[in-house]
Amino acid sequence: VSDGGATALEATADPATGDDADAAGHAARRARFLREQLPDWIFVVAAVATVPLVLFVFGKDQWFLRDEWFVIAGPDGLQLFEPNAGSHWIAVPRLIYAVLWRVFGITTYWPYQLSNVLLHVLAIVMLRVIIRRSGVSNWLATAAAAPLLLFGPGSQAIVFGFQVGFTGSLAWGLAQLVLADTEGGFKRRDLLALGCGLLAITSSGIGVTTSIMVGIALLLRRNWRMAALHSIPLLGIYAIWARVEHASSGSQVGRPSAMELIRWDRDTIAATFAELAHIGVLGWLIVALLVVGVALAIGPWRDKPWDEIRRQWAMPVAMFVSIFIFASMTGMGRWFSGEAGARSSRYLYLQAVLLMPVVAMCAQEVARRWARLTPVLVVALVLPFPFNLSAFDDDIGLGKSFVEQRKYILTTAVR
């Protein structure tokens, strides 16, 4: 009887137990979706939507300007080793423009823009990958990276087709860093990483900064041999090219003094913080977040072994240091343009991208200890986004009317 009674009790208990298990499984899947998959999908949708938004909304009035004509009007468009503006190696942009010129001519601008927009999206995708690999949660990684997809203060690097060199160097440099982020000795992906590094240095002078950045990151994350392998050959190739082609990063008005260079660095980095935050108090909150996050990570409140800290912070620290390297290298040639030059849209864009991993890491340190602050941190990171959209300026250059007039003349006068 007891066996029969036990069997009967089990028979009546099993359905309830099964229902409880199903409910628990459903709750776990829902929690996982909200915690991991939803922020991933939000970022994917935002990245895909960026392309048509730039081409047909924010950059719809952009047309050929300045340096583009030097490339298009060249003898054959393939002077692959000739410096642009006296200092940049732009072999990759020259190739892209040569192909597009032969296919589309100057009857439409969007194919030229598309090349740059795709590289811009690649750069921000690589940025989010780096942030995630550094140990930042999905929500904070998305909140840090997604607003940069339509970063109005950096609009020049997004809507201007010829920034395929500037933005391209950043994208290829970040791709090199992601590919080189592996364990052990030399692998096939290291070869692919070096290929990305070569594309970076042959897209613009920004490739020099990204090569140094990758070297610093791998020195902290892997070993000195891999760091040297991923930086010294690329820097050597660039140095040889600069020597042979007589490229110079200086200006015609001479070199800046130490104080002038410091002033440039101060102005351009301060402008980056200001434009990222948009609202003054948020800028100071970002600074406070950096201080608190670093203190929690390496100060008396440290709760991880140093080796783990070194590996997690390697890429964000390398990118943060690269801000100062880039600012100083740019200041050497552009210092005479003063604060207005230091606040150039494309500089703010690159520096914002390089800054964001450290900001995200510091936010993660706070959220890891006080989980209830995570939604607050997410909101703080995305709050400037709608305000920064207004910084997109269709009148890049000499104004919309000038662009329309130039476009009309050049596309009809030869008929």
Predicted features and spans:
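Short hydrophobic alpha-helices at membrane interfaces in multi-pass membrane enzymes
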Residues: 178-200, 225-230
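Transmembrane-helix signature of polytopic, membrane-embedded enzymes
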Residues: 127-151, 170-171
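Membrane-interface alpha helices of multi-pass inner-membrane proteins
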Residues: 189-205, 210-218
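Signature aromatic-anchored transmembrane alpha helix within multi-pass, membrane-resident enzymes
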Residues: 231-235, 316, 364-390
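Membrane-lumen/periplasm interface segments of multi-pass, membrane-embedded glycan/lipid transferases
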Residues: 7, 65-111, 231, 239-302, ...
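Transmembrane-helix motifs of polytopic, lipid-linked glycan transferases
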Residues: 114-137, 175-179, 292-299
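Membrane-embedded, lumen/periplasm-facing catalytic core of multi-pass transferases
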Residues: 342-346, 374-415
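Perimembrane helix-loop-helix junctions
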Residues: 4-5, 209-239
